[in-house]
């Protein structure tokens, strides 16, 4: 991702990001001396206002960065939403930087659509993905990008100086991963659907308000009813870890807006771990 930002932008350029956002994005933009321009996603569906988005493009944005499915909201962008974004990219001559690491974790009623498959978008889209989630090898830190040759040439230049390269044994193993049959992805998706149902059903029974994720493996829960007056989400999360034994991430890590009542919890765990977490939360 950071190599792509360096490859596509110049110092002072603006990059549009939806909020809530994966916290690394802001830091990566700042590293490239770029200015983030945030467009809010409105819960519970995390939709966006098309006029607000176009106003962001009108500021002369060089690119828009989208996590689809989204970390942390679990939003899966619809075809109509992506089509609108693509039309704005073309109209204002901007790139689309797509973080698609959760592309195979999408739940019933939703479908992951690749931005570079839309008319006029192949030449202005960089699709970034990772082996971490799809093949459960998060510790390997292996990722890849797909883009037109002229853009890839620049990305590779930055990647060479930033990273040099991944360990060759891991790259050989990655080839095996990428050659998995379709049945693997079907079983993989079904497994995550099972974990999601187990965890969200438990939250419903306990009565903790949350937004139902459309993809990825996160839940944004509303801690407002449980907070003391003047308590921050950071303090709440620290107390949760120390006294309840359940770790969550404060929402202020992800929102550009003044949000203090949301935490992110992830459910990519064994069944017994999820049951234990739900028991501690009840």
Could you tell me what each predicted segment is?
Residues 1-282:
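PLP-dependent class I/II
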